[in-house]
Regions:
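Solvent-exposed, flexible loop/coil residues
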Residues: 8, 13-15, 61, 66, ...
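Amphipathic alpha-helical interface surfaces
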Residues: 35, 39, 62, 81, ...
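Extended, low-complexity, intrinsically disordered C-terminal regulatory tails
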Residues: 37-68
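Catalytic cores and adjacent binding grooves of peptidoglycan-active enzymes
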Residues: 73-79, 87-141
Length: 141
C-alpha cells in the first residue's frame, strides 16, 4: 500500500454528513488491501499524478444512502472491492486516466473485475475480486 490507505477507502463525505459509521469489517480488510496493492497502486504509479477516492468501501447503510445497488462491489459482495476514483481535474483528465487504466488492463499489467467510465468521465469505477476470475470488463455508464 504505497499510494492509498485503508482510511481513504473508508472515508465518505456522505457518511460524515449523515453520521454513518463506515468502517471496513475485519473480514473485508483483505479485499481492500488487494484492491490497493494489485489495482490502485499500479494505476497511480503509471499515472504519476494524485488520484483521489470518491467512494471506496460502503457499509449497507451508506450504500443505501448513496443509492447504490444491493449487489454493489463497494460492499465487498462476492469477495470483491471497489473504488470510485478521480483526478479532481475534470473530465478530460479523468478520460486520460481511464485510458491509462484501460491500457494497463489490455496489456495484462493489472486485472480488474470492472472498469467503468461513469457519467462521461465524472469519475471512474474500478473493482477487483480477490477470489475467482476478474472479468476485465471495460464499460461506460
Amino acid at each position: 500500500m504505497k499510494y492509498f490507505t485503508i482510511k481513504e477507502m473508508e472515508f465518505s463525505a456522505v457518511a460524515e454528513a449523515k453520521g454513518i459509521t463506515n468502517k471496513i469489517p475485519p473480514k473485508f480488510i483483505k479485499n481492500y488491501v488487494e484492491l490497493i496493492d494489485k489495482v490502485l497502486d499500479p494505476i497511480r504509479a503509471q499515472y504519476t499524478n494524485p488520484i483521489y477516492v470518491n467512494s471506496g468501501y460502503r457499509c449497507k447503510e451508506l450504500n443505501e444512502a448513496v443509492g447504490g445497488v444491493e449487489t454493489s462491489q463497494h460492499t465487498c459482495i462476492n469477495n470483491s472491492a471497489a473504488a470510485d476514483i478521480t483526478t479532481n481535474k475534470g473530465r478530460e483528465a479523468n478520460k486520460v486516466l481511464f485510458h491509462i487504466i484501460k491500457n494497463l488492463i489490455q496489456t495484462g499489467q493489472i486485472k480488474v473485475d470492472q472498469l467503468i467510465n461513469e457519467n462521461n468521465y465524472m469519475w471512474i469505477h474500478v473493482s477487483y475480486k480477490i477470489y475467482g476470475k476478474n472479468r476485465n470488463q471495460i464499460l461506460a455508464l
